[in-house]
Amino acid sequence: MRVDVDKYLFIGREKSEFFSACREIGAVEFLSKSKLKDSEKVRKLSEGLKVLNLLTKSCSPADLVSTKSGYLVTEQLLQEIFDLNQEITTLTESLKALGKEIVRVKPLGDFSSEEIRELTLKTGLAVRFLYKRHIEGAPLEVEEENVFYLATAYNYDYYAVIGIVSLSKDIFTEIEAPRSVNELREEEGHLQALLRKKKARVCELYAYREDLLEALCEQCNEQSLQHAEVSAEDLFDDKVFSALGWVIVDRLDEVKKLCDSLGIYLERVQPDPDEVIPTYLENHGLGALGESLVNIYDTPASTDKDPSLWVFFSFFVFFSMIINDAGYGLVFLATSLFLSFKARKQIKRSIALKRFLQMFMILGLGCVCWGGATTSFFGVSVSYTSPFREYSLTHFLALKKAEYYLKERPKGYKELVHDYPILKEKKTPKEFLLAQSTSSGDSVYKAVVYDKFIDNILMEIALLVGVVHLSLGMLRYCRQRYSSIGWVIFMCGAYMYLPIYLQAVSLIHYALHIPYELGGLVGYYVAFIGLGVAILGGVIQRGLRGLDEITAVIQVFSDVLSYLRLYALSLAGAMVGNTVMVMSERFSPAVGILIIIFGHTVNIALSIMGGVIHGLRLNFIEWYHYSFDGGGKLLHPLKKVICQKSQNL
């Protein structure tokens, strides 16, 4: 629900007390010429928390310490966190470099760098190391005195040289080795021990994380209060202040009571002509879930009706139709219940996580219901006579259509009988519907009529959902756009007329029993009446410029046809699921299970992407076009954040 917001002027003396009290109420956003910027303390605390969270990721849950080892003031704690981060980063980089050095000098073997230095001092002979490219079959030893073969590694031959020898620089390359591999490994062990010690200290500091959260919360509260106080203008040598603010209308009585207690004068003022009035949404339950979806795309304008519930229910229907699989719905439902149980502590501290799991659970339930209505379960081919199919929505509608075909014998019936002569013998709707035959180029017997009817029904349901969805949006916004009523009438008329034009049978004929010819004739005239009403509404609202409303007929048609994506995406997912099951039957059970798991995992991921993207797109693009202004900004009232140590910031 969108709550109105009005602009008020506040004048009084008790400045600090007034703003502190307003913060407790949380019903006023004060207007300020400057944007709220984080103070140095807030930035430092935020950075400290980020660093601590990043560092503690390397700690296992068992290593995290929950008991404090002593008292630390916030400044000391932050400084130690930053120092540890720097030291751990330095040690990690040193270990990486040391590891590369060990790999480089490993072929030289174990030696003492100290003994080599003593040998050089006593004899004046330098000990050097060289390497050359290894040639298969070539002798490893070199016919030079004081040149000793050490090893072959990495496709190179390594040598030690004592004193001065004449070796070709084109073949041999000197390698610097100030320390041997055993000395490097000794240093590596020392650094690793030091790194473990630093990480252990990080695990101990995890016990102070709640203190940092509380300190950050307090600083944010203090910062927002100071910013609000700065927005006020001081008058009469700072004895009186004045401030402008947006007040939530439903909370106006609380604000007036506060002002009376502090002797503050308040007066409603008109917003500036170019001023954007903030939008305040207040939703609970399913409306709160819808509000989360609405905020993904745009903020409603202050003149918009709150679309939260509409968007949620529409998204629920679209997502269920796109997934179109009861098995996948059970997976979503089971996963959401499992995560809700495992993350029950986090749910208490995170509203976003709680809403996400609730939405996931509801969407899973919707997928189960729609998948059951269309007899779709993990892509498994269900028998035409299965009870699971007989009690489904699509089977019921298909029987109704078959009954209509046998009774009225429309053009579609004649075409089917021509293509499949066996249908002439069928007298009952069920026999006609389940008659099996082979398609051209196919040797498998299938209930061809049944499959055709189901495809047509699902496609028409998608279009019908589009007409209903757009009509609801237009009617919801008809006070702001008079032509909307005409377009609703036009869509209803077009829906009745087009089956006649296409010589097809529609749901309205066999399910709603609307006469075929009469319904088409009425629809033809209703469509033109609706077009005229739309143009008339545009002229009444916008004068002669409203005549361009006739061009919107293309937009309306394209928007309705856009809902065919519901059918197309569901069909694609069903085909992939069925293909996975067919492929798994060609292999052994072990391989088949792997194919099923992998194939359905990929299909679920793609289906979720399609359901989310296109389910939201139909709301935000097609539906918003007729029932939403947008371009608003959310109201951010001065409000005290409750500083609880268990609060997830």
From Swiss-Prot:
It is a multi-pass membrane protein. Belongs to the V-ATPase 116 kDa subunit family. Produces ATP from ADP in the presence of a proton gradient across the membrane. The chain crosses the membrane at residues 312-332, 360-380, 453-473, 485-505, 520-540, 556-576, 593-613. It is found in: Cell membrane. This is V-type ATP synthase subunit I. InterPro entries: V-ATPase_116kDa_su (IPR002490). One of its GO terms (molecular function) is ATPase binding. Coiled coil: none annotated. Keywords: Cell membrane, Hydrogen ion transport, Ion transport, Membrane, Transmembrane, Transmembrane helix, Transport. GO terms for cellular component: plasma membrane; proton-transporting V-type ATPase, V0 domain; vacuolar proton-transporting V-type ATPase complex. GO terms for biological process: vacuolar acidification. The lineage of its organism: Bacteria, Pseudomonadati, Chlamydiota, Chlamydiia, Chlamydiales.
